[in-house]
Regions:
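Short, Lys/Arg-enriched N-terminal segments with co-localized hydrophobic residues
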Residues: 10-19
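Divalent metal-dependent phosphate-bond-processing catalytic cores, especially two-metal-ion Mg2+/Mn2+ enzymes
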Residues: 20, 36-45, 49-62, 75, ...
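His-Asp-centered metal-binding catalytic motifs of divalent-metal-dependent phosphohydrolases/nucleases
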Residues: 66-84, 90, 94, 111-121
């Protein structure tokens, strides 16, 4: 495993009474590092690791189950429809990993439910049922904001052959899940179609504060981008 941060959070989870063997966090970290070894479009291993770190920090403040939050955060993209459409519906890879490591049926159900609630799906997006789900959803959405969010947006757009910006292509809003997944637009439009909608979807107070700061940074960046696009000095 690379880096010391997961170890810090893992030890803290154990100290707070987590009932699952702490080695599963190590194994999950190694597992997702291998799964995403060839992913460079914004949903890579380092995205997963950032979501894990942020989710567990939020979970501490919200008194949520750190083990459930940590595992759901680490595994949240393993069966993502964009990356593994053949396993998406039943969370096959997530379930197989958890069963292999002795997770209870209740924990597997909880983690799979959280993962199913994470994604932004336009007007069909859901509010997680549990505080653990809210922590993971907030962490995943926070990683789409700020400086990292900008970099990820352009990395994803470039890897999928999207135009950075075209003033003649207007953003589409109020899309449902099907429309959102099928929609092809520019990377700049993605700011309006998704990224600038995330702040108001945050569930926890700590995430709301971070989201506001990061959104302001993105708006300042986009203003500068559009000025430079027009050749303004």
């Amino acid at each position: 495993m690379t880096g010391s941060e997961p170890q810090v959070h893992r030890d803290r989870a154990v100290k707070q009474g987590s009932f699952m063997d702490k080695t599963i966090i190590d194994d999950a970290t190694d597992y997702v590092k291998n799964v995403f070894r060839n992913e460079f479009g914004g949903h890579d291993y380092f995205h997963t690791l950032r979501v894990y770190k942020t989710a567990t920090k939020i979970a501490e403040q919200e008194n949520a189950d750190l083990t459930v939050v940590g595992l759901a955060a680490l595994l949240h993209d393993v069966d993502d429809v964009k990356l593994s459409p053949e396993t998406h519906a039943n969370k096959d890879r997530t379930v197989a990993f958890l069963k292999k490591h002795g997770a209870s049926e209740a924990m597997i159900k909880s983690i799979c439910e959280i993962i199913g609630e994470v994604s932004f799906l336009g007007t069909d997006s859901v509010v997680p049922k549990t505080i653990e789900g809210k922590c993971v959803q907030d962490a995943d959405r926070l990683d789409a904001l700020g400086a990292i969010g900008i970099a990820r947006a352009f990395a994803y757009g470039g890897s999928h052959g999207r135009v950075m910006h075209d003033p003649d292509i207007k953003p589409s809003t109020n899309m449902n899940a099907t429309e959102y997944r099928k929609h092809v637009s520019t990377t700049v439009n993605h700011f309006y179609e998704k990224l600038f909608l995330l702040k108001d979807s945050m569930n926890t107070d700590s995430a709301k504060k971070i989201a506001e700061k990061r959104e302001n940074y993105m708006k300042a960046y986009l203003s500068e981008f559009l000025s430079e696009w027009e050749g303004l000095l």
